[in-house]
Amino acid sequence: SVVQNSLFNRRIHTLTDIEISGPLRGNAAMVTKYSPNGTRTRGTINNCASGYTPWGTYLACEENWAGYFGNSNPGTRSSNEQASMRRYGVRATVGNGRENWNTASEVGQVGEPFSRWNVGIVGGTAADDYRNAANTYGYNVEIDPFRPNSTPKKRTAMGRFAHEGAWVGPVEAGKPVVFYMGCDSRY
């Protein structure tokens, strides 16, 4: 049965503070109003098949995440940025997102937590808005279930796509640890 007051009874969701790890940590593409230095992001979404690691953590895999985002002013993005957004499935307009979360802050309903779903350029710099928020999704999120106060980490070194899952391959002493991953994109 569920132990309601257990330290291990933990919820990780779209508002959880998450660390960005790996080669994209601190990269300009990860800078947002939430994390001006590009080392953190808010939340994880559409987590699919959880793989485990030999060291006792698990990997929650973000799949089909792009549809939650919308862009209030796509004409301000470079052609390369627009191509990248199309490739991943980020919507070119506001109001076309899966849940229309990207419209909530525009009408003044809820404010800051929902502003990040609008990847339009609305501030002077990337640290003033959420133009890069979509760049912080599409990764494997490592969670330590035995350290309830630990911060989940998005493992950017494992690549970015619509992760279906990540499972460790056969572990052999003296050899690199290998993970097998599946992509569950909907194009």
Language-model region placement:
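Conserved small-residue
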Residues: 1-187
